C-alpha cells in the first residue's frame, strides 16, 4: 500500500521543463530561425522571467518558427496556439498528445518543445512561490524547516490550522517533509493533529476546482512534497498519515504525544498503521493504538454513566418509555461485553404506524456509530415480496444479470459489518427472504451471490412490523382507561397522595395468548421467532405525549416561519388541546402532523398569499373566544362538540402589544368554481 502512495518517478518532473527552456540547443535553434516571443523592449516577457526565477536575462526565447507550434504574428509578437489556449483558460492536459511528443512520459522533440514549455512557464508563473498572506508564509516556512520564521508568524497572528487553497495544513506540510521541530512548535501553538487533508488526487482536485491538472501538479510538488504519487487519493489523510509515509520516527512520536488519533481513517478507510514500514514506526503505532483504544473505552464508559442511552433516546423520541428501556438494556449488555459474541442482536418492533419504530432504530444507529452514514442500513422489505426479488437481497448467482453488482444487504454489510440494519415492514417480505434472515440471525454470517461470506456477528438487526398493531393499540387503550378509572376512584376516596399515571405495561398473558399466535400464523415458523432477542411493543400516545407532539410540530413551523419569512409565531395553551383532537390511533404522530398542516399552516399560507403578513411581524395562534367555553366545559355533549369543533384564528401583535384579528378570505368552495371550456 505504501508503494501506491510514494511516487517512483521515471518521467521528467514538470520543473524539468523549465530547465529545458535554458538548454543550449533551444538557444541555437532560436538563432537559426531568428524568431522569438517577446514583449516590450527588454527581449523577454515579464511572466517568463518570474517563472524561471524573476531575473533579467534568464528566460530564453521560445521556439515558434516551425511546425504546429508556429502561430500568427500580431503587433510584433508571435502568439502560439498554446498561449492562445492559456488566454482562454484551456491549457492542454499532460496526458494529451502534443505535436512532437509521443506521450507525457516521453522526451519532447524540438518541434513541440516551444509549445509545451510556454504552457509550463505560464502555469509556473500563476502559481509562483510568493506568499500573499501570513498563512501562506507559515506553510512555506514549515516546508523550509524555518523554526524561527514559524514562531514569528504565529506570534503575529497566523492561523495555525489554516488550509492551503488545495486543502492541506502547515502541520501536514511539516510532517511529510520530516520537520519534527516545526511540528513541535505548531502543536504547541494549538494545531489540530486530527484534521484531514481536503486534497484528493491531482486530476480530481483539478476537476473539482476547475483548474488545469498541471497547475495542481506543480503546486502540490512545490508547496507540499514531490515524493508522493499524484494519481493516488490523499483525501482525509492526517498529519500522522503523512509522517508515517515519510517514515520519520521523531515526527510520528511528536504527533502521538500531541494528541493525534492513531485509529483515524482516511477516505480510503486506512489508518496510519496501514502505511507503516516494518521497523520502529510500526512498533510505535501498534503500541499507541492499544493505549488509545483503552483510553477511548474508559472515556466512552464514563460518558455512558453520565449520559445514559435511555436519556439520549428520549431527547428525540416522545413517549415509548418501555420500548426505550428494553432497547437500552440490550445495547448496554452489548457495549459492556455481557452478550453472546457468536450471534448478532435481533429486535422485532411491533406497533401501529407513525409511532416511533423507525425513529428509534435511527437513533440507535446514531448512538452506536456517531452519525456515520454507513452505520445505518435500511431495507424496505416491501421491495422483496416476490420470489425472484430474493436475488436483490444477497446478489444474483453467476450467469444472471446483476451478478457483478452484488446484493443490497451484502454489499453494505461488507462496508460496515457492525452496522445497525433495519428491515422495515418485514411482514411484507417473501418467505424465502425470511429463510435467509433465519441463517443470518442464527449464524451471524451471510454468503452473497459471488460465494463470499460476510461475517456480521457484531451487527444489530431490527425488524419492524404492523402485525397485531390493532390488538396492541386496543389493549393499551383499555389498560390506560382502566388505570385512569382506578386513579379517579382512589382520588374520590380522599387519598391525596394518588397521582394519575399514563404509564402502562403489556401483560405477559396478553403477549403469550394474543400476540404470539398472530406472529406464528404470519411467520409460520417458531425457529424464526426463537432467534429474536427482544420483541418490543410500541403503544399509542397518551394525552400528555400528544401535547408534546403538537408543541414539537408547532415549534418546527415557528422556526420555519422565522427563517424563511422573518415572522415570529406564538400560540396559546388551548391551541394544543384543540389540535390533539386530530389524533388517530392508527396513524400515530403523522395524524398530528397532518392536523397542524390543515388547521394552522393552511391559514398561514393563505394569509401570506393575501399579503396580510408584513415582514418582521409577530403572529399568535389562538382559539375563538366563543369556542373557549367549549374547551372549559367537559359536560357539553360529544354531539355538540362534533357539530361545532373549536376554531383557530391568527392575530397580529402590534408593537404596543395590541392584537387584531387577520381577515383571511376563504378560497372558493370547490362546488362554486366554474370551469370555462
Swiss-Prot record:
GO biological process, one term: cellular response to heat
InterPro entries: AAA+_ATPase, Ankyrin_rpt, Ankyrin_rpt-contain_sf, ATPase_AAA_core, Clp_ATPase_C, ClpA/B, ClpA_ClpB, P-loop_NTPase
Binding site residues for ATP: 316, 318, 353-358, 425, 466, 531, 590
Keyword list, A-Z: Acetylation, ANK repeat, ATP-binding, Hydrolase, Mitochondrion, Nucleotide-binding, Repeat, Transit peptide
Site-annotated residues for Cleavage: 126-127
Region Regulatory, annotated ranges: 477-505
Functional summary from the UniProt entry: Functions as a regulatory ATPase and participates in secretion/protein trafficking process. Has ATP-dependent protein disaggregase activity and is required to maintain the solubility of key mitochondrial proteins. Involved in mitochondrial-mediated antiviral innate immunity, activates RIG-I-mediated signal transduction and production of IFNB1 and pro-inflammatory cytokine IL6. Plays a role in granulocyte differentiation.
Subunit structure: Homododecamer when substrate-bound; the homododecamer consists of 2 homohexamers stacked head-to-head via ANK repeat-mediated interactions. The active substrate-bound form is likely to exist in a dynamic equilibrium between homohexamers and homododecamers. Homotetradecamer in the unbound state which is remodeled upon substrate binding into the homododecamer. Interacts with PHB and PHB2. Interacts with MAVS; the interaction is enhanced by Sendai virus infection.
PANTHER family per record: ATP-DEPENDENT CLP PROTEASE, MITOCHONDRIAL DISAGGREGASE
Protein name: Mitochondrial disaggregase
Source organism of this protein record: Bos taurus (Bovine)
Species lineage: Eukaryota, Metazoa, Chordata, Craniata, Vertebrata
Primary gene name: CLPB
Amino acid at each position: 500500500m505504501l508503494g501506491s502512495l510514494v511516487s517512483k518517478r521515471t518521467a521528467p518532473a514538470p520543473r524539468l521543463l523549465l530547465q529545458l527552456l535554458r538548454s543550449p540547443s533551444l538557444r541555437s535553434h532560436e538563432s537559426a530561425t531568428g524568431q522569438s516571443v517577446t514583449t516590450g523592449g527588454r527581449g523577454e516577457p515579464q511572466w517568463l522571467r518570474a517563472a524561471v526565477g524573476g531575473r533579467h536575462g534568464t528566460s530564453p526565447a521560445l521556439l515558434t518558427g516551425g511546425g504546429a507550434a508556429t502561430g500568427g504574428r500580431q503587433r510584433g509578437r508571435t502568439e502560439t496556439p498554446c498561449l492562445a489556449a492559456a488566454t482562454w483558460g484551456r491549457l492542454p492536459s499532460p496526458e494529451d498528445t502534443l505535436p512532437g511528443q509521443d506521450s507525457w512520459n516521453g522526451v519532447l522533440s524540438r518541434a513541440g518543445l516551444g509549445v509545451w514549455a510556454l504552457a509550463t512557464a505560464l502555469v509556473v508563473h500563476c502559481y509562483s512561490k510568493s506568499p500573499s498572506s501570513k498563512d501562506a508564509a507559515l506553510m512555506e516556512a514549515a516546508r523550509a524547516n524555518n523554526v524561527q520564521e514559524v514562531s514569528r508568524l504565529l506570534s503575529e497572528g497566523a492561523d495555525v490550522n489554516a488550509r492551503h487553497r488545495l486543502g492541506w495544513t502547515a502541520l501536514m506540510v511539516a510532517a511529510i517533509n520530516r520537520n519534527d521541530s516545526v511540528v513541535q512548535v505548531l502543536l504547541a501553538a494549538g494545531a489540530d493533529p486530527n484534521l484531514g487533508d481536503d486534497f484528493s488526487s491531482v486530476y480530481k482536485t483539478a476537476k473539482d476546482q476547475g483548474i488545469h491538472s498541471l497547475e495542481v501538479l506543480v503546486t502540490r510538488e512545490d508547496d507540499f512534497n514531490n515524493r508522493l504519487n499524484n494519481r493516488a487519493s490523499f483525501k482525509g489523510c492526517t498529519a500522522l498519515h503523512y509522517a508515517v509515509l515519510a517514515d520519520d520516527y521523531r515526527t510520528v512520536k511528536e504527533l502521538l504525544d500531541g494528541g493525534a488519533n492513531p485509529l483515524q481513517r482516511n477516505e480510503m478507510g486506512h489508518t496510519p498503521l496501514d502505511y507503516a514500514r516494518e521497523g520502529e514506526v510500526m512498533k510505535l503505532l501498534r503500541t499507541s493504538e492499544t493505549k488509545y483504544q483503552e483510553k477511548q473505552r474508559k472515556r466512552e464508559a464514563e460518558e455512558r454513566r453520565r449520559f445514559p442511552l435511555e436519556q439520549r433516546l428520549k431527547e428525540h423520541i416522545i413517549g415509548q418509555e418501555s420500548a426505550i428501556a428494553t432497547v437500552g438494556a440490550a445495547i448496554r449488555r452489548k457495549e459492556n461485553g455481557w452478550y453472546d459474541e457468536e450471534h448478532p442482536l435481533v429486535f422485532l418492533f411491533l406497533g401501529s404506524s407513525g409511532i416511533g419504530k423507525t425513529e428509534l432504530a435511527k437513533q440507535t444507529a446514531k448512538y452506536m456509530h456517531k452519525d456515520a452514514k454507513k452505520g445505518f442500513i435500511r431495507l424496505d422489505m416491501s421491495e422483496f415480496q416476490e420470489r425472484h426479488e430474493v436475488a436483490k437481497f444477497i446478489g444474483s448467482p453467476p450467469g444472471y444479470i446483476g451478478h457483478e453488482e452484488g446484493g443490497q444487504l451484502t454489499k453494505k454489510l461488507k462496508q460496515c459489518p457492525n452496522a445497525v440494519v433495519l428491515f422495515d415492514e418485514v411482514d411484507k417480505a417473501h418467505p424465502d427472504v425470511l429463510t435467509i434472515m433465519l441463517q443470518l440471525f442464527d449464524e451471524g454470517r451471510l454468503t452473497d451471490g459471488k460465494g463470499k461470506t460476510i461475517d456480521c456477528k457484531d451487527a444489530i438487526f431490527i425488524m419492524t412490523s404492523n402485525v397485531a398493531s390493532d390488538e396492541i393499540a386496543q389493549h393499551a387503550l383499555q389498560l390506560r382507561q382502566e388505570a385512569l378509572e382506578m386513579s379517579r376512584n382512589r382520588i374520590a376516596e380522599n387519598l391525596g397522595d394518588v397521582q394519575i399515571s399514563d404509564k402502562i405495561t403489556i401483560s405477559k398473558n396478553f403477549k403469550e395468548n394474543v400476540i404470539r399466535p398472530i406472529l406464528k400464523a404470519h411467520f409460520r415458523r417458531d425457529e424464526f421467532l426463537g432467534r429474536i432477542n427482544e420483541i418490543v411493543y410500541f403503544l399509542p400516545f397518551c394525552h400528555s405525549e400528544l401535547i408534546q407532539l403538537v408543541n414539537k410540530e408547532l415549534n418546527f413551523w415557528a422556526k420555519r416561519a422565522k427563517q424563511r419569512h422573518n415572522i415570529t409565531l406564538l400560540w396559546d395553551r388551548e391551541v394544543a388541546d384543540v389540535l390533539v383532537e386530530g389524533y388517530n390511533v392508527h396513524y400515530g404522530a403523522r395524524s398530528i402532523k397532518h392536523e397542524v398542516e390543515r388547521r394552522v399552516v393552511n391559514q398561514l399560507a393563505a394569509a401570506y398569499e393575501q399579503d396580510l403578513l408584513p415582514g418582521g411581524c409577530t403572529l399568535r395562534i389562538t382559539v375563538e373566544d366563543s369556542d373557549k367555553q367549549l374547551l372549559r366545559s367537559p359536560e357539553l355533549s360529544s354531539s355538540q362538540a362534533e357539530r361545532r369543533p373549536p376554531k383557530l384564528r391568527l392575530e397580529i401583535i402590534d408593537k404596543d402589544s395590541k392584537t387584531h384579528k387577520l381577515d383571511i378570505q376563504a378560497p372558493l368552495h370547490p362546488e362554486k368554481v366554474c370551469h370555462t371550456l
